[in-house]
Amino acid sequence: MKQLRMLAIDTSTEACSAALLWSDGEVHQRFVVTERGHADLILPMIDELLAEAGCKLKDLDGLAFGRGPGGFTGLRIAAGVIQGRAYGAGLRVAPVSSLAAVAFLAPSPPSAPSSGVLVCNDARMNEVYWGCYRFDPGAPCVPIVLAAEAVGPEQEA
């Protein structure tokens, strides 16, 4: 089976990242934590990864970007950069939940179907973005829908 060749970026948080999965199965990556400047960083990161792997954008099978949740400006940067690059190279685009991507990397997926992984990310202003995900063998990471009561009682500000 052919190894999928993908470029993925995420600018939805303070972490600005790009990763390239190339034919050799090796992952080439760049990662910088900064409050601002993602738009200035992401394009050079992409160019560096392609040069490092010795390939061109049109050699890839597709592109992916972190669709959040996250800051509005960061989400627009990732979506705009990937859509622009994909259009120019004739590639398909896959939006990926940033929370689901973290859940997928949990050290040891739960073995019981009723258990899951909770992922939280700082949304600033004393709030968090969060998602609860379940793992089923041979299936993608699936979000769990919880009733408001399961999360906790409403609190007065």
Label the predicted regions.
Residues E52-K58, A86-V96, S111-A112:
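Phosphate-handling active-site elements
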Residues E14, G68-P69, A123-N126:
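Short glycine-rich anion-binding loops that position phosphate/pyrophosphate groups of nucleotides
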Residues M1-R67:
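N-terminal beta-alpha supersecondary unit
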Residues S23-E26, G80-A89, F135-G138:
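A glycine- and small-aliphatic-rich helix-loop capping segment at beta-alpha/alpha-beta transitions
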Residues K2-L4, R92-A157:
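Surface "functional belts" at beta-alpha junctions
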Residues L41-P44, G80, A101:
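Short amphipathic alpha-helical face segments that pack within enzyme cores
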Residues D47-E48, Y87, P107-S108:
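Short glycine/serine- and small hydrophobic-enriched flexible loop segments
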Residues A64-S98:
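DPxDG-like acidic metal-binding loop motif
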